[in-house]
A protein has these predicted regions:
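Active-site loop segments of alpha/beta catalytic cores
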Residues: 1-34, 39, 43, 56, ...
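Short, structured active-site "lid" loops
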Residues: 44-54, 62-64
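Intrinsic-disorder/low-complexity, polar/charged segments
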Residues: 48-51, 102-109, 119, 292-293
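Active-site loop/lid in soluble adenylation, ligation, and acyl-transfer enzymes
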Residues: 38, 60-74
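Active-site nucleophile and cofactor-binding loops and adjacent substrate-binding regions
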Residues: 47-48, 73, 239
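A contiguous, low-structure linker/loop signature
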Residues: 72-115, 138
Length: 348
C-alpha cells in the first residue's frame, strides 16, 4: 500500500479511521527560524506578506517533515482589522510578535465595523491560504482563530473586561455575544477558503484565570455556538489549567481537544474515555528551545503518547528559535513511537 500523505493521515485521524502512524503536526504556529533563514528573510516580515507567510509555513513543514501546517502567526490580525492598529516591529531583528497598540478602554467605545473582514491584513491571510492550497496539496492546511473571550481581550483591555464581569455583567455578555459572532464568521470564512481544519484557541480562559463555574456560564455557551457552526474538523484548544473544565470542553462539541503541559492527560483520558480525540501536551519552549538532552526530549514526547494522546501537540505555538536537534528528536519520536495505535485511532 502506498504511503499516506500528511493530509490523508491527518484527515483520517480526525475521522478516527485507521492510519499508518501518529501524524506529526499542530494547529498552532510551527514556523521556525531555520526555515526563515533558508528563505533569507526575517521573522518580522512574514506577518505582512502573503508569499512570505505561506512560504514560512511550507518551508518549516517540509524542513522538519511535518504532516500539516497552520497560519496565521499572530493574535493581532482581527483587532487590527477592526481599527485597533498594529505594531509589526518591522525593523526588529529578533522574534517579536505583532501586538495591538490601541485596545478599546471602555465598553461604550466598542464599535465593530461591518467590513473588518476586508481590512488590515485579513486579505493577506486569505491570499496566503490560496498559495498554500497550490504549494502544499499534500499537507493538512489549518487555520486558527481566537475564541470569543480571548479575542475580546485583544480588542479591549483585559482588566476592564474582567472588572466588567461584576459591574456590567449584561453589557459584557452582550459584547461577548458580538465577538462570538465574529469568531463564527471567521471560521465560516476560512472554511470557504478550503482549509482542512480549524483550531479555536480560547487561550485565556483556563482555570488559572476563571473559575469552573464562571467558565460554564461565560465561556462554554459561546464556544458551543462556535463549534456548532463549523462543518470541517475542529479543535478546542485551551492552555493553562484545564483539569477542572475538561469535561465541559468536550461538551462544546469540537472534534478534538488540545491541552498544554498543565493538564494531567492520563487522567483526562480516563475521564473522557477512549473515543475522544485528545492532542497535547508538551511545553514547546521548555522542550524544543531550552532542553539540553535529546534523550529528555524523546522521553517527553514518549510520555505524551503513553498518557494517551492521539496526536502529540505543543501546548502553544512553537517558539521559532528551536534547537535543530530538539525539533528533529520531537518529529522522529512521534513518527517512530507513534506507530502503535492511540486510544481513539487504530493503525492500518
Amino acid at each position: 500500500m502506498a504511503d499516506l500523505t500528511g493530509k490523508e493521515r491527518v484527515m483520517k485521524m480526525f475521522k478516527k479511521e485507521p492510519i499508518d502512524r501518529m501524524p506529526c503536526f499542530s494547529g498552532q504556529g510551527t514556523v521556525t527560524v531555520q526555515a526563515i533563514e533558508k528563505m533569507e528573510t526575517q521573522f518580522a516580515k512574514i506577518h505582512n506578506d502573503a508569499k512570505l507567510m505561506a512560504g514560512a509555513a511550507v518551508t518549516s513543514a517540509r524542513m522538519w517533515g511535518l504532516d500539516g501546517l497552520a497560519i496565521p502567526y499572530d493574535m493581532a490580525i482581527v483587532a487590527e482589522a477592526m481599527g485597533r492598529g498594529v505594531s509589526l516591529y518591522d525593523s526588529a531583528e529578533g522574534i517579536i510578535y505583532p501586538t495591538v497598540p490601541n485596545k478599546w478602554k471602555d465598553l461604550d467605545e466598542i464599535d465593530i465595523p461591518g467590513n473588518y473582514m476586508s481590512q488590515g491584513r485579513m486579505p493577506v491571510v486569505d491570499k496566503a491560504f490560496d498559495i498554500l492550497k497550490n504549494d502544499a496539496p499534500d499537507l493538512a492546511i489549518g487555520a486558527w482563530v481566537l475564541g470569543p473571550f480571548t479575542l475580546a481581550g485583544q480588542i479591549m483591555e483585559l482588566d476592564i473586561l474582567l472588572k466588567g464581569l461584576k459591574k456590567k455583567k449584561d453589557q459584557i455578555e452582550a459584547f461577548l455575544g458580538q465577538v462570538t459572532q465574529v469568531t463564527i464568521d471567521l471560521c465560516e470564512h476560512y472554511e470557504s477558503l478550503g482549509v482542512d481544519f480549524i483550531t479555536v484557541r480560547e487561550m485565556g480562559s483556563g482555570t488559572d484565570l476563571l473559575s469552573p463555574r464562571m467558565w460554564k456560564t461565560l465561556i462554554q455557551p459561546n464556544l458551543t455556538k462556535v463549534f456548532d457552526a463549523i462543518s470541517i474538523p475542529s479543535v478546542n484548544h485551551i492552555c493553562g489549567s484545564t483539569d477542572m473544565i475538561i469535561e465541559m470542553m468536550h461538551e462544546c462539541g469540537a472534534d478534538a481537544l488540545s491541552v498544554d503541559q498543565k493538564n494531567d492527560v492520563a487522567e483526562t483520558r480516563k475521564k473522557l474515555g477512549d473515543d475522544v480525540l485528545i492532542f497535547g501536551n508538551f511545553d514547546p519552549y521548555g522542550t524544543l528551545t531550552t532542553m539540553e538532552d535529546i534523550g529528555e526530549v524523546e522521553n517527553v514526547i514518549k510520555q505524551c503518547v503513553d498518557n494517551g494522546v492521539d496526536a502529540v501537540w505543543p501546548g502553544c505555538d512553537i517558539w521559532p528559535d528551536v534547537k535543530q536537534e530538539n525539533m528533529e528528536a520531537y518529529v522522529r519520536t512521534v513518527k517512530e513511537y507513534g506507530i502503535k495505535a492511540s486510544p481513539a485511532v487504530g493503525r492500518i
